[in-house]
A protein has these predicted regions:
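Alpha-helical membrane insertion/targeting regions
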Residues: 1-166
Length: 166
């Protein structure tokens, strides 16, 4: 997408780093797979520095800490026209991945786990599919960002494009 201008190295770095937030959101779904295959915990390493930021913000601001981090990302980066379109697009895409994971987490906690139990085959399979899908989407997007390309994830990318102004 050359019509948006060339993508500088610093934009590639920041475009890659924002996906650490999506990896942090995927940590919740990693329990079953990481317990069975500890090697998968390697894929969670980029999310741990974000866990420190979230923990600090929650301790400082209470239950509004994670909302504050969301607002900083959305208003400070996505809606800031002085930041390159590439970084804003990737930030919006990681916010959408995080929202999707949060919605899945709510559905799991309030509907599926009470109905099927906490450790059945169905629940474990859902956790593993959501975890692997979110990790695959995050790492795919990180690799595309390093290469200076826009990561195209069906539906999520379309929503990100509609939210990011030119």
């Amino acid at each position: 997408m050359a019509w948006r201008g060339s993508i500088e190295i610093k934009d590639r770095i920041f475009g890659t780093l924002v996906y650490c937030f999506a990896i942090f959101d995927a940590i919740f779904f990693s329990t079953f797979l990481v317990n069975q295959f500890p090697l998968f915990s390697f894929f969670l390493l980029p999310g741990f520095p974000i866990a420190v930021v979230y923990r600090f913000s929650v301790q400082l601001f209470g239950m509004f800490g994670s909302f504050l981090v969301f607002m900083i990302l959305f208003l400070g980066i996505v809606r800031n026209d002085r930041i390159s379109h590439f970084v804003r697009y990737n930030t919006m895409q990681t916010i959408l991945i995080g929202i999707l994971l949060s919605l899945i987490q709510l559905i799991m906690q309030w509907a599926l786990i009470p109905a099927f139990g906490n450790s059945g085959l169905f629940i474990e399979t859902l956790y593993n599919v959501v975890f692997l899908g979110s990790i695959a989407a995050s790492y795919y997007s990180m690799i595309q960002s390093v290469l200076g390309r826009y990561a195209e994830i069906p539906t999520i990318s379309e929503a990100a494009y509609s939210q990011v102004r030119y």
